Amino acid sequence: MFSYYVHLAIRSLRRNPVLTTLMVLSIAIGIGATMTTLTVFHILSGDPLPGRSRQIFIPQLDPRPDNQPGQHPFDKLDYTTAMDLRRARRADRQAVVVDSQVKLRAPETGRPALMLQMLSTDADFFPMFQVPLAYGSAWSARDDEDRARVAVISADLNDTLFGGSDSVGRSLLVRGSAVRIVGVLGRWRPSPQFYTLAGGGFAHGDTAEFYARPQDVFMPLSTSLEVNGDHFQPWTCFAKPSMPLNLPSAPCVWLQLWVQLETPAKVAGYRRFLADYAAQQKASGRIGRSDTAVLLSLPQWLDHNRVVPGDVRLQSWLALAFLGLCLFNTVGLLLAKFLRRGGEIGVRRALGASRRAIVAQCLTEAGLIGLVGGTLGWLLTLLGLWALRQQPVAYADLAHLDVWTFAGTFLMALACSVAAGLFPAFRASRIAPAMQLKTL
């Protein structure tokens, strides 16, 4: 019976190609615009560490000695707090992180010096965040302690300097200091760049830079303080620092500490440790209040920083509203089309067709329109994502169609077209056969 409905639907659509084209275009444009924006929203709001994000936590503690009730802790830690928590080693893995600019060159390539982004961190950073390595390995905890002059570089920098070949063992000059490459990252593009997130709560939706590519150079924090320490910048200072600025002793926050806690018991234990540490620091007079100590999971941290850019959220709502307008137009066109066929429907009802059969026939026709519109909408989605990749935004390279989007495009098109056809189909099924037969 379904094949018969499809045959009738195709004949009906061919009978009025202009009206059919208008309905298909209405569905296609609405689906294309909506799926383009929803694809971007889906990518930007995804889990940057699938399967592990709920084991990753970031501690916060306000170091201000004059902190007042109602003040929230900074998104970063001061040097004393970060080092105290790091030395305690209460987590399964832990890593202090701070990013900065760095000037480097590869002497053997003869290329001019480059100004790049560097992440200073600890050896646990790589296994904790499941960072893939194409060549070599990360440095060891012993390298952290020994302030070893070693580095891991990104795949992009390896392509630029060494043509993508295995560069392990080669040297870089970082601020004039020789540093040996021990590893090269594989293709790694966390979305967002969660491990440096800060300040999203007061960014007013301007968070596109949270989706920037990973840093080009990774070095032990202990080494970076020697090699590039003069070029670290404070995130914010809660008192006037002395000059020249010495960040490790300055009243400034500029570091983040990430910890991995694999069980709920370990999470509870770390929270107790953090509370005890805060109480101890308050008793010593270093901080003003101890109740600012909190431990946030990675998903909570993403929510805290409101990572999805405000313009992407707005575009998603506008696209959904536009889709609603397109569906409203489709409802009107389908209603006009079905009511125009009142004579045909009246004859079918007089010959014994049930109202359910009429509804099924009309919905099959609406579904066929949705299928064609979905195919065209999928092509428009591809075009929209291509156009987005040409834009100068940090997340432009992430805009690609995935399986979810591909399937969602057709499911949404079918669902929307069938939903748009419900009211016209119901009205068509209520046509009185006797009244239509009198007009024949």
Residues covered by each model-derived region:
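Transmembrane alpha-helical interface segments in multi-pass membrane proteins
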Residues: 21, 328, 344-389, 408, ...
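Structured, solvent-exposed hinge/loop segments at the ends of secondary-structure elements
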Residues: 38-161, 165, 174-179, 190-193, ...
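Mid-to-C-terminal secondary-structure elements
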Residues: 123-138, 149-306
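Generic structural signal for small/hydrophobic residues in well-ordered secondary structure
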Residues: 13-16, 35, 44, 58-59, ...
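Short, strongly hydrophobic transmembrane alpha-helices
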Residues: 16-49
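C-terminal membrane-exit region of the final transmembrane helix in multipass inner-membrane proteins
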Residues: 408-440
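Intracellular coupling helices
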Residues: 6-18, 328-364, 368-369, 430-439
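Membrane-helix entry/capping segments
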Residues: 1-4, 10-11, 15, 19, ...
